[in-house]
A protein has these predicted regions:
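Non-cleavable N-terminal signal-anchor transmembrane helices
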Residues: 1-42
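N-terminal small/glycine-rich loop or linker at the start of catalytic domains
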Residues: 1-18, 66-72, 109-119
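Acidic-and-aromatic substrate-binding clefts and catalytic sites of carbohydrate-active enzymes
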Residues: 40-53, 72-84, 156-162, 183-192
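Short, glycine/charged-enriched secondary-structure capping and boundary segments
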Residues: 20-22, 55-58, 115-118, 164-167, ...
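Active-site mouth loops of central-metabolism enzymes
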Residues: 11-25, 44, 72-83, 121-129
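Acidic (Asp/Glu)-rich catalytic clusters
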Residues: 1-2, 30-35, 48-67, 84-99, ...
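Hydrophobic faces of well-ordered beta-strands that scaffold small-molecule active sites
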Residues: 3-9, 41-43, 65-70, 101-103, ...
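Active-site acidic/histidine proton-transfer and metal-coordination neighborhood
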Residues: 79-178
Length: 195
């Protein structure tokens, strides 16, 4: 049985704290991932977002784009504005033949605010989650209909983080969670060979 495995560049550098591991180049990251047996890599801050430039670099290491973070603002924003915000990444991921965009809601998040304790993260009522769930479901449907589905990434310091928040999110939305979507992509790429 063969499976394709992908990894995120956060194993080599941190997009939120640029000063961490700034000495690791994109090519070194891809080389090490390839040697370790990974065939997919999420995008990160060192990735050119143009397949004409990125494609040959990925091909050199036998790596493909398997996803990548999008900092969503739909909780407090307008769906049409969010479509405009994601359009460039949407087009790039289609060109890269990526399985999905990783959508993380960053509106109201305390992530990156070093003086803010994690306990001060925003919390939504069930009624607010229901409104957000309908909004993100409509947005996810639009993304999928236009050729690039999203997977939802719950995240520390964000409005959807805890198990209880995930339960409410799943109750009020149709958006697949990141681990479920990636597992589905992984299982669909498994092939059996006789040996």
């Amino acid at each position: 049985m063969k499976a394709k495995l992908g990894i995120a560049p956060i194993a080599w550098w941190n997009d939120d704290l640029a000063e961490l591991s700034d000495d690791v180049s994109l090519e070194e990251c891809l080389r090490q991932a390839s040697v370790a047996g990974f065939t997919g890599m999420e995008t990160g801050r060192r990735f050119p977002m143009d397949m004409a430039e990125l494609g040959p670099i990925l091909a050199k290491y036998g790596i493909s784009v398997c996803g990548g973070w999008f900092s969503g603002l739909l909780l407090d924003g307008d769906i049409e504005v969010e479509k405009d915000r994601i359009a460039q990444q949407h087009a790039f991921f289609k060109a890269a033949k990526a399985p999905c965009i990783v959508y993380g809601e960053t509106a109201r998040s305390v992530q990156g605010i070093k003086s803010a304790p994690l306990a001060t993260k925003p919390k939504l009522t069930e009624a607010e989650v229901a409104v957000y769930g309908r909004k993100i479901s409509d947005f996810a449907d639009w993304c999928a209909k236009n050729g690039m589905p999203i997977s939802y990434h719950h995240h520390m310091a964000a409005v959807i983080e805890t198990e209880a928040e995930l339960d409410l999110f799943m109750k009020h939305s149709t958006v697949p969670l990141l681990f479920r979507k990636l597992l589905s992509c992984l299982l669909s790429s498994i092939s059996f060979s006789e040996k």
